[in-house]
């Protein structure tokens, strides 16, 4: 369950209806921490212009979930919705570094993560969801400077930041950056990142003197 639930905005708005002024009160709530509704009857999670402090969304094993439309959240870096047999629409973009979802027509999950200082996104929508092109094709994207490529199963999958898929994939968006934290970005950082991306080694065991 969410760590904290609190009110962040209280608004009184006057609206004319048929020449009569009505006053409405709006109380917007904010969530902090992990939003874990896994295994519940939740049907949709949407953020129509509302920003929260949620850092992770967990909606796996939700049989009735059909829509995950959680975008432009400045603190949310992870989202997962696996084993949701009715998931028809997904819209995840913002500052995500780890996404795991499986639309109902995909035979395997979409697993996206990052290596370096970038973000990933995934957009997919069947007809009637009003998401994407509504053509059962998913759009994968990488955002950030010094993008090197998408890597999957030890080899490069795409040199383009954006590409389309019609089924699941496990891929890492690789970005050059200050991998060894020495205060500068050099070819050594890029080589180290690429080695980790293709599975030659992992980031914790890289000897940067030899990279």
Pin down the residues of each PLM region.
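N-terminal capping/linker segments that flank leucine-rich repeat
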Residues: 1-46, 61-63, 85-129
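Conserved positions within tandem-repeat grammars
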Residues: 3, 8, 29, 33, ...
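Extracellular beta-strand-rich, repetitive "passenger/adhesive" scaffolds
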Residues: 28, 48-53, 70-75, 115
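Tandem repeat domain/solenoid detector
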Residues: 55-56, 63-66
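Short, tandemly repeated low-complexity microdomains enriched for cysteine and small residues
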Residues: 80-81, 99-105, 122-123, 153, ...
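Secondary-structure capping and domain/repeat boundary segments
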Residues: 106-176
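Cellulosome-associated attachment modules in secreted, modular CAZymes
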Residues: 172-211
């Amino acid at each position: 369950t969410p760590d904290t639930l609190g009110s962040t905005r209280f608004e009184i708005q006057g609206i004319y209806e048929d020449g009569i002024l009505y006053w409405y009160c709006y109380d917007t709530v904010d969530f902090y921490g992990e939003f874990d509704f896994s295994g519940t009857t939740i049907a949709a999670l949407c953020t129509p212009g509302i920003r929260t402090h949620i850092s992770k969304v967990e909606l796996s094993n939700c049989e009735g979930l059909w829509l995950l439309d959680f975008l432009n959240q400045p603190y949310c870096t992870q989202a997962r919705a696996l084993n949701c047999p009715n998931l028809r629409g997904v819209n995840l973009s913002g500052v995500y570094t780890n996404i795991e979802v499986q639309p109902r027509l995909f035979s395997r999950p979409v697993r996206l993560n990052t290596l370096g200082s970038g973000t990933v996104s995934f957009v997919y929508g069947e007809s009637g969801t009003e998401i994407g092109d509504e053509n059962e094709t998913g759009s994968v994207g990488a955002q950030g400077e010094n993008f090197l490529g998408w890597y999957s199963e030890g080899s490069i999958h795409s040199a383009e930041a954006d590409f389309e898929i019609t089924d699941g994939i496990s891929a890492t968006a690789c970005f050059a950056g200050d991998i060894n934290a020495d205060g500068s970005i050099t070819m050594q950082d890029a080589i180290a990142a690429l080695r980790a991306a293709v599975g030659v080694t992992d980031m914790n065991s890289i000897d940067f003197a030899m990279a």
